[in-house]
Amino acid sequence: MTQVKKWSVLPVILLLCSCDEGQKVKPYTGQSAHWQQSAVPISLQCAACHTKEFEDWAGSDHAWAYRTVNPELDSEPFHGQRLQAHGSELRFTTAREGHLLLADSESKRNFTVHSVLGRRPLVQYLVQGKDGGLHTPSAAWDVTRRGWFDMFEADERLSREGSATRNAGDWGHWQGRGMNWNSQCAWCHTSHFLKNYDATADRYNSGWKEPGVTCIQCHKLSAAPSADGCLVAPGERTLSAQQMHDNCATCHARREELDDSFVVGDKFDDHFRLELPIIPGIFWPNGMQRDEDYCETGLRLSRMGRAGVTCLDCHDPHTATLKLPQEDNSLCMRCHATGTVVGSTASPVIDPATHTPCPTGSKGARCVECHMPESPYMARDPRRDHSFNSPDPELSAETGVPNACLNCHKDKDHAWAAGVVAQKYPAQKAARYRARTRAVHHALAGEGNTQELLAALAAEDVPGWRATLLELLARQEQTEEIQQAARAAMKDENAMVRAAAARALGEEALPLIHDPVKIVRRAAAWQNIRHLVNSPQAADALAELTAIARHQSDQPTGAMLLAMLADAQGNTAEAEQQYKRAISLDPASAVAYMDYAVFLARRNRPMDALQQMLNCTRVAPQNPEGFYRLGLILAELQQYGYALSALDKALQLSPTFHRARYNKAMLLQHLGRHQEAQKEMELLRALQTPPTPTQP
């Protein structure tokens, strides 16, 4: 048996063998008795036979994803340094007993540092929260610059929201639920993690089998060692490329977690819902990352993902580094030099010397600089985009999508870059790509046009984009054309497309509650929740929906889902309690106030509903839906002047807001202002989408 070179991996061995406080008091309960009683960490048992793989892994970022505090590694950042962040001063010191301390002037508390995330280019230190979970302060240690910094120092989200800080009590404040490690980080920084949240006590009792992303996160354990001594059952040792990719995607994706029971070999879509470009500010309308979006969405939206390219085509599974260098384009040329067939598609043959207008050997001549530009995560961690778009300066000027040309040519503008692109690639910009980007851009800006979206859908063959366009169509005023497109999509082979179709179809999607994939069943179930409550045949669907909501109940979205379930089941008191709980978890959530207001309005409590809608418009003054709903409630209260003002504000924020214009026209008609009402209806007809009235 080959021996592991312990001196080369000693730090990782020590990390595996150390048993942190979280594991002592919160034992992992999801493992078989054999592994729970094992005295030697499983990954070290793997190393006995798989020496090379273990040593490769020991030097990877996966191995260092989570660990306990180590005085030798962590003393430098805790020598009295100070950092001003979000109205508070943070001070980092070391106690006499050797504990690392974080002092927060805002809460006037000293926190003992519990554990550590990552190792480069930044390190995050976790502290214990009041809810039994761990929290990630907004301060992180820059390994290269050797200093503390605020991870939100250049956060576009804060500027979009009109705020410069994350205040105490906010969901996104570091002591809030948005920065709770157990809910937001732990699945991807430990192996075999279980959240174990107790909603009644509002406390976490989480557990994990091993710190970091270890062997057992990517290789499925057998119930006991096999006859050959291997810890992985013979039938589980060979996985398909898609199964391995789905395992990577559980962490390298911006996604909604439906449960924490994923094991290697499962489908991603049975446990997670992938985030698509359907919410403003999250992705650019061409699918490029705008926020911290990770890799999976971009890849699923790309032609390469459509062809069958997966993570392991480019990345080594154990070192987690690239298989070939990117600097000389050898990684990309591995396929694009000879037209390698991936799946059933031949890669386009590319000659780097003639393909780019940039000089050979320059930074701009690297494939990744144009097709995978970097964006900063946590302010100082540059990560590459995986949507594999081509620079289109014309679209950049029109829609704001990133223009990679200007990353190097900072003294130039979009017009200059557009001229270069037009000269070099006179006929290579696909009309379909531009039409789709414009359609998504208009929809995200609240100016969606049904015909534009339908045309883009009809021309699209990438499943991720088909799902995106259907999701955006589901938010439009429904027409027979939309319904026909959604009915056809119900039979699509891709689960994301079927789930999007369910959201557009409503009651017609009821048969999809029996779909083999969870994201589809879940989408169809929410559209038919009242049917589920009253149908014994739908008991399984209702139980699954309830389990998802309970799993997410530590977050405001989960509380709102529980509220809707309780409401559908006629439990008004429970529903109201959950709406209030959602607001307490995120006092700045416009959606929570809005949904609560709708709930109250339907129970003939218009004054209470009015107060919640005023709260909604206060926290989200740029949200047209909020002012629209406010206008409906004011009209119900016969405050017609104020109602018109609210509807006007909604239309000012979104001139193509069909429902707002329709209801304004109806209100003007009610007030006897017929010419003004007729003018509004003419404007509405010009939008070419017949409206339907909406009640609050």
Question: Whereabouts are the PLM-identified features?
Answer:
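Primarily the internal scaffold of c-type cytochrome electron-transfer domains
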Residues: 22-33, 44, 52-118, 122-130, ...
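Helix-start (N-cap) detector for alpha-helical repeat units in TPR-like alpha-solenoids
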Residues: 495, 518, 556-557, 590-591, ...
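Structural marker of alpha-solenoid helical repeat scaffolds
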Residues: 476, 492, 515, 551, ...
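Structural signature of tandem alpha-helical TPR/SEL1-like repeats
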Residues: 479-480, 535-546, 569-581, 602-615, ...
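Residue-level detector of extended alpha-helical repeat arrays and alpha-solenoid scaffolds
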Residues: 466, 498, 521-522
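Amphipathic alpha-helical scaffolding segments comprising HEAT/armadillo-like alpha-solenoid repeats
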Residues: 447-457, 478-490, 505-514, 534-547, ...
